[in-house]
């Protein structure tokens, strides 16, 4: 293993000089002797000098310190030993529960599966959230994006999906916290303990591995932590489960993909690259592709991923969310307008889409009900301007009916969440897809036109709406 010395330090960027015939390769991990600091090679500048990004704080480092080339990229522990543990970007434990006992370590830089190895799935993944199951259904082994500005509920929606899917789905999950709040990571860990997904008595019985690179960490950590989490998920997908003899079906949760892009922007600027549109790095599409192409399903197992995507200034045309759109099978768009009406989850039923919304995949009935709901909501959206100027009285009877039904649909798309019980006091509801389709089919057919729209708000199934309406009727009498 070759060794060199630090010749320049600018924040998180360090230049290291090696002998000309021992220059490290791009992405090689270097260890600063006598410290915990790991560096990753980003550029070869010539004359034996490489430019690196520090995976951690550079406090206390100085010029002429000795650096050793590890001879390979950053590697992280993989396998059953990672379950129930919280690790950093380098796979080091940060939960104060002792070392991670793993038999293998995998490099975080890996080739994406070849076209021949990939497999398609049209099997639906039921989430128990009405608006998602009806209008933007998820595929097993698919990629889902939760798009939204600040404070519209991306993390809460993701937590509910973890609660509904990961707890019912018997497989394993990996959670990558990329540049998010430490408080949220802490809350998530304790929620997983309460739910029994993390078993601190016997980690081998746990169902989730957690990798965190939070907001307060240097850009190198935030840029690579998504790859560390993905590598752990790939191991479960690609290695045979002793019980079944084939790869596992894994859930990968990434919160937040925008922070991954932002860390790339910071690193790009530190490396002296010329910025591109809106100040983003010129390699934005390539970096996003390198990550997303690896999140896929193969013949041996599947990775179903749910990714939260922050939308800066609520602008979906911003280069970062716009680049992410191209890679996803389903997009759940969270709207500030809907959140301001108190309707949660604040999913925009007209903007959210899914490739699975096809009669050949989900069946004629589901497809027709979903399109019927969207048709009513779209017509209501068009009528809003007329109502604002002339009032409801100027509408035809047919249009009035559309408005009343649309308002009921809007409210019925809201739902109390299990993870929000502590804040709202309302018990969470899991609504099976079969019930969701039947309920909305009846609403657009006019079967519940006589019920007040308040009864539809924050209800689970349609039976609950009917019971609420009866209660309101008796209390008014």
Swiss-Prot record:
Matches recorded under Pfam families: ATP-synt_ab, ATP-synt_ab_N, ATP-synt_VA_C
Keywords: ATP synthesis, ATP-binding, Cell inner membrane, Cell membrane, CF(1), Hydrogen ion transport, Ion transport, Membrane, Nucleotide-binding, Translocase, Transport
GO cellular component: a single term: plasma membrane
InterPro entries to which the protein is assigned, alphabetical: AAA+_ATPase, ATP-synt_VA_C, ATP_synth_F1_bsu, ATPase_a/bsu_AS, ATPase_alpha/beta_chains, ATPase_F1/V1/A1_a/bsu_N, ATPase_F1/V1/A1_a/bsu_N_sf, ATPase_F1/V1/A1_a/bsu_nucl-bd
SMART domains in alphabetical order: AAA (SM00382)
Catalytic reaction annotation: ATP + H2O + 4 H(+)(in) = ADP + phosphate + 5 H(+)(out)
EC number: 7.1.2.2
Protein's UniProt keywords contain Metal-binding: no
Disulfide feature: none
Transmembrane segment boundaries: none
UniProt cross-references to Gene3D superfamilies, sorted A to Z: 2.40.10.170, Bovine Mitochondrial F1-atpase, Atp Synthase Beta Chain, Chain D, domain 3, P-loop containing nucleotide triphosphate hydrolases
Record's bilayer topology term: Peripheral membrane protein
Localization annotation: Cell inner membrane
CDD domains, per database record: ATP-synt_F1_beta_C, ATP-synt_F1_beta_N, F1-ATPase_beta_CD
GO molecular function term, any single one: proton-transporting ATP synthase activity, rotational mechanism
Binding site for ATP: 148-155
Matching SUPFAM superfamilies: C-terminal domain of alpha and beta subunits of F1 ATP synthase, N-terminal domain of alpha and beta subunits of F1 ATP synthase, P-loop containing nucleoside triphosphate hydrolases
Family: Belongs to the ATPase alpha/beta chains family.
Family annotation (NCBIfam families): atpD
Function: Produces ATP from ADP in the presence of a proton gradient across the membrane. The catalytic sites are hosted primarily by the beta subunits.
Assembly and binders: F-type ATPases have 2 components, CF(1) - the catalytic core - and CF(0) - the membrane proton channel. CF(1) has five subunits: alpha(3), beta(3), gamma(1), delta(1), epsilon(1). CF(0) has three main subunits: a(1), b(2) and c(9-12). The alpha and beta chains form an alternating ring which encloses part of the gamma chain. CF(1) is attached to CF(0) by a central stalk formed by the gamma and epsilon chains, while a peripheral stalk is formed by the delta and b chains.
Protein's name according to its UniProt entry: ATP synthase subunit beta
Source organism: Psychrobacter arcticus (strain DSM 17307 / VKM B-2377 / 273-4)
Lineage of source species: Bacteria, Pseudomonadati, Pseudomonadota, Gammaproteobacteria, Moraxellales
